[in-house]
Structures are given as C-alpha cells and as structure tokens.
C-alpha cells in the first residue's frame, strides 16, 4: 500500500471516530443534582433531626427528618393528616395509613377521605328527637348525636335514611379491622355548624387531601345531620359557605363522613 493510500485511510478512520463520539455526546444525560435527589437542607437546618444523610455530590447538602416527621405529632392541627395510629403530620408519612384530615382542632374532628351522593331520607317524616331548626348554627349542632338520633328512629320505624346510614357504615378503604376507633360505627354525618367549620378550613383541608391522593371537597351542596322540618334538612354549599334547606329525598347532594378523635 502506498503512502497516499495509508494517509487517506487514516483520515477516514479519524473522521469516523469523531463522528461516533459527536453522536454519543448529543445523547448525554445531565447528571442529577443534590436538590433533585432530595438533599435540600443544610447542617444548621437539620439541627433537630434524628436521621440525616449527606449528599454524595456535595457534603454540605443534607436530607434529614425530625422525630415528629418520622412518628407523627400527637396533637392534630387544622389541615393535618390523621393516621390510623391516631398521630398527625403536615406532610405525608408514607409508612403510615392516612384515614382523614383535621378540620376542627378545638373539637377534635377530622373529615373522611371519601364522599358520595345520597338522599337524606327515603320519605318525608319528622324525627321527634331532632329539633326543627330555623338556625342551623345554634340548633342541633352535635353531628354525632344527630346521626345517632336519625339511625335509632329509622330502625325503630323501619325508615331509610341513606346519608346517615352511609356515614355510620363508613370505614376507610385501607382499614381491615372491625373493632377500631376509626372503623364502621365511629363516623357520623356532620351538623350544619360542623360543615360551616369545614368550609372555613376548606383550603387547608383540600391541600392535605391532595397530599394523600384523596377526593377533595368540591363546590357542591353537602348534607348535614341538622333537620329543618319534616320535609327539609339543612345543607351547606361548599363553594361559598351558603347554608340552606332542601327536600330530604333529594339524592344529588354530597355526603362526607366525619370522625371524632
């Protein structure tokens, strides 16, 4: 092989290698940063942490957890996630089972992660043990007592009250035990006053419901356990907090169980 041929072949091999290298360079993937890996804290910010890891790319960046973030808080605040072990947290603890979201800190009430649409009653009839309330904020304000009165009257008189019955039968879908403080029998249909508190904290509650991938409160009418008359029961429009009464057999209103913890 003459000298010119060798030079030409060498040049071709060089160009081929360069072309392959350039092609590979175009498909390079940007390496992850400490931030994208979750190492977003500094040593000072991790002062109360009980568990922490340093970023392998930058030792000054850390991931850390406090004991409260690991175990949950023993006291529930508005917008906190309520777990099956009766602890609470602002952010989701993946090792725990969420069952509700706190909406009334003073009265220790949490709303369920689910809802449905049902009628308040199958027929028009007054429940003697419930007050016929002209003001839902000062009359029959205890939803648990109201629900018990509705259920007891229905059983004694062979009457159907779908909204209250749904709440009493409700339990979180992740619960398999029947004898726990949050299982069937513990939940109730909230009073209109309790719904009013739920509406006041709707933004915080919906933020928490989103964190646990649960159904958020919609801009819909929600039934309460507060009776207005033999034909009507109180409801609340979750869009603006407006309160009113509707026919008990109207089946398109929403029902959201509540739990006392």
Model regions: which residues?
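Bacterial N-terminal signal peptides
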Residues: 10-19
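Short linear Ser/Thr-Pro motifs
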Residues: 17, 112, 224-226
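Short hydrophobic beta-strand that contains or immediately precedes a catalytic carboxylate
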Residues: 111, 189-190
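Mobile, glycine-rich extracellular loop/lid and propeptide segments
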Residues: 186
